[in-house]
Amino acid sequence: MAKKSMIAKNDQRKVIVERYAEKRLALKKALVNPESTDEQREEARLGLQKLPRNASPIRLRNRDAIDGRPRGTLQKFGISRVRFRDMAHRGELPGIKKSSW
């Protein structure tokens, strides 16, 4: 079980990323647009620097949806590898069975 403060911090970051997503995308497009002038690129770069650090999606952490474990998370299921294995053995994941050869 992860610390509740770390789970809450990650949830708060998700909100901030969502809030600034459109503005961040517009600034990034201005940076890579070949038709924009050097002044426009400079303004876009400064605009990106003024955004909060937590507005970047890179700072988000994929966590287990049930207990918040930060590592070994399977994206397809949203749970950690440990929890996935337990749930699969108990038959709680439809369509998942242990392979044997």
Swiss-Prot record:
Keywords from the named record: Ribonucleoprotein, Ribosomal protein, RNA-binding, rRNA-binding
Keyword set includes RNA-binding: yes
GO cellular component: small ribosomal subunit
GO molecular function: rRNA binding; structural constituent of ribosome
Top-level taxon of origin: Bacteria
Pfam families: Ribosomal_S14
InterPro entries named among the record's database cross-references: Ribosomal_uS14, Ribosomal_uS14_bac/plastid
GO biological process: translation
Subunit structure: Part of the 30S ribosomal subunit. Contacts proteins S3 and S10.
Function: Binds 16S rRNA, required for the assembly of 30S particles and may also be responsible for determining the conformation of the 16S rRNA at the A site.
Family membership noted in the UniProt record: Belongs to the universal ribosomal protein uS14 family.
Full protein name: Small ribosomal subunit protein uS14
Primary gene name: rpsN
